[in-house]
Amino acid sequence: ASHWKFTEDPAVLDLEGAFTEIPIASMNYSPLFFWKLFVLGRLNPVKHKPIGNGLPAKGGGSKKELLTRSHHLCVSADGYFSTQLNRALRKTQQANDPFLVVIGHPKALTQFGFKTLESFIAQHHRNHEFVTLSSVL
């Protein structure tokens, strides 16, 4: 299911539940992905600088961990992560899943991410429906 209702435990369906669970897509990101992310951010900081004036929360992993081992993370439209949207869509289609839920956060959006997301939507809008969270609930 693309989403379901629950009351206390998101793993227990409750058709009358007050809360809605919407599973976010996830996939593996290799160390090479993070090397590219860090290098491109250093080579062209204006393009990869977050647009907002906020700061994202510190993650649990160190840069060393990101650069040396794969990580299973959510599919995101933020910054350089947006370069993986086509791969996420292929993975979703191969799994015969009708939904690809992508997240983004205003504190992490960049000019690069906006352009990549815009290209992704332009490339796929004829064959896929793009919706917002508010239109699903």
Residue ranges with predicted function:
Residues 34-36, 114, 136:
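Generic alpha-helix signal with a bias toward terminal, lower-confidence helices
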Residues 22, 102, 132:
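Conserved, mostly hydrophobic/aromatic
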Residues 63-64, 76-124:
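Extended, basic/helix-rich recognition subdomains
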Residues 25-29, 105-109, 135-136:
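Active-site beta-loop-alpha junctions enriched in small/polar residues
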Residues 1-3, 130-135:
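His/Asp/Glu-enriched short active-site or ligand-binding loop at hydrolase and phosphoryl-transfer sites
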Residues 1-93:
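Active-site-adjacent pocket scaffolds in enzyme catalytic domains
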Residues 126-128:
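Non-catalytic interaction surface on structured domains
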